[in-house]
Amino acid sequence: MRIITLVIIHCSATPQGVRLSFDDCRREHIRRGFSDIGYHFYITRNGEIHRGRRHSIGICYEGGLDIRGTPADTRTPAQRASLVALLRELKRIFPKILVVGHHDLNPMKECPCFNAVAEYGGLPKLK
């Protein structure tokens, strides 16, 4: 088994009130020249977790923009609960992972529109 040490959280940059399904996100990534969706997991607003790419661990939640299109933490309670459950499971499988946001690797990005390190830095202690 390969050793995973980093989990990157993304947002889809989808305004509140606009739906971007897993299939829509996949189609958009392929249209932009990717071979497949760019994420390992995609969490829709209802908290449903969809599996995407198999060769990396990037988690994307549907949202990240307010109704004006401004970057904002738009996670629903269902998305927050699903993200915690998913991160706990990934931590169980890959105990050495560090959870970061996309902007922690590229400061030019707002994504995921919240401070993932502050929120999930104590991953083993998540409640």
Where would I find each of the regions flagged by the language model?
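Basic/polar, cationic surfaces and motifs that engage anionic cell-wall
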Residues: M1-S12, R45-R54, E62-K127
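Secreted/periplasmic proteins that engage bacterial cell-wall peptidoglycan
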Residues: I3-H55
